[in-house]
């Protein structure tokens, strides 16, 4: 589950729980799984009414597949598993007032990147799995070609550009290409797109920041 969260992989995790009437009594095999995974799921549900199941599953699949994708956990007590839903209806729409995923770029940050790009002499783009999940490979390639900017990728970003493309330098990080790492380290502007600034990709942060 934690790996799916880190890699932005949509996942629905269904777990079993003790009888709902026994929740909180520390009975045999009771585990606060929703609390245990709180830091590495997008959302978690503890179903206490069998009639909530259609809505919960509709919401869970929506949350897992929108915004930055990731895992959602649904914990179902044994009595709810054995209960019968009367007048089953799977909702057509989702109404989540508190869930508003970011789907548009930050205008001020984009303008800042453009200004920095105009000044840069050795810019480079590091693309991650977010580009693939957003199906934005074509837009990335067009942007790189229009501005003549080399592209490197994280492991999750392999496939953002054809390996034979003259602007694609390969994968960076601990297991990446030497020349790709060197190109990123010696750039004067690093544009991260759909990638986390993690140690697996940015293996030598001191070299990168030295030229920025």
Residue ranges and their predicted role:
Residues 1-212:
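N-terminal alpha/beta PP-like core and its mobile active-site loop of ThDP/TPP-dependent enzymes
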């Amino acid at each position: 589950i934690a790996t799916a969260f880190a890699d932005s992989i949509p996942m629905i995790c269904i777990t079993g729980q003790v009888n709902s009437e026994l929740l909180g009594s520390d009975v045999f095999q009771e585990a606060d799984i929703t609390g245990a995974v709180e830091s590495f799921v997008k959302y978690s549900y503890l179903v206490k009414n069998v009639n909530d199941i259609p809505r919960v599953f509709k919401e869970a699949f929506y949350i897992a597949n929108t915004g930055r994708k990731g895992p959602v956990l649904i914990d179902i007590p044994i009595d709810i598993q054995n209960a019968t839903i009367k007048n089953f209806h799977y909702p057509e729409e989702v109404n989540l007032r508190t869930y508003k995923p970011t789907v548009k770029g930050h205008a001020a940050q984009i303008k800042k990147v453009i200004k920095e790009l105009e000044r840069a002499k050795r810019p480079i783009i590091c693309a991650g799995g977010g580009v693939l999940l957003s199906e934005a490979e074509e837009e990335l390639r067009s942007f790189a070609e229009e501005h003549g900017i080399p592209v490197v990728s994280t492991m999750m970003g392999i496939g953002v550009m054809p390996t034979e493309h003259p602007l694609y330098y390969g994968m960076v990080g601990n297991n990446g290409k030497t020349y790709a790492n060197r190109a990123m380290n010696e750039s004067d502007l690093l544009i991260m797109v759909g990638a986390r600034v993690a140690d697996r990709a940015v293996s030598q942060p001191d070299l990168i920041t030295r030229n920025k």
